[in-house]
């Protein structure tokens, strides 16, 4: 694995599959405006950090409030992961990729947001969750 080969490791099939399922569950929850489903994909701890388009959200309560407000302002949300690469450092899996959100606001206005993101995931209490997510809008 590139210049980081001594540190970074490719994922074994089981870990890769589990992380692909995590991504799929998150995409489905966001596209269904399912707050509980989205929150189930995230670390349930004050240590959770999301950096979304310049806004730092710390802990599940802040993320839940953000999602509640976002979903309340949208008639529909559709998320698609365009591409993603996963690798591990010890017990942590990192991912980097791009995604596209398609929104329809309550007034019918449609918009598209493309993002580049990096996240860190860990297996906590038997399930993989996002512990850090940093997304930046692509112009």
Q: Language model features by range: what are they?
A:
Residues 1-40, 47-139:
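A beta-strand edge to alpha-helix "cap/lid" segment located at domain peripheries
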């Amino acid at each position: 694995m590139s210049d980081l080969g001594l540190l970074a490791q490719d994922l074994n099939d089981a870990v890769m599959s589990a992380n692909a399922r995590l991504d799929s569950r998150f995409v489905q929850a966001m596209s269904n405006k399912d707050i509980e489903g989205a929150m189930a994909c995230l670390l349930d701890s004050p240590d959770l950090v999301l950096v979304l388009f310049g806004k730092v959200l710390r802990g599940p309560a802040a993320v839940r409030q953000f999602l509640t407000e976002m979903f309340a302002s949208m008639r529909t949300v559709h998320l698609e992961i365009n591409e993603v690469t996963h690798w591990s450092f010890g017990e942590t899996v990192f991912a980097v990729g791009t995604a596209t959100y398609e929104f329809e606001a309550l007034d019918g206005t449609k918009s598209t947001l493309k993002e580049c993101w990096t996240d860190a995931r860990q297996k906590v209490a038997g399930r993989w969750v996002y512990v850090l997510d940093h997304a930046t809008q692509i112009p």
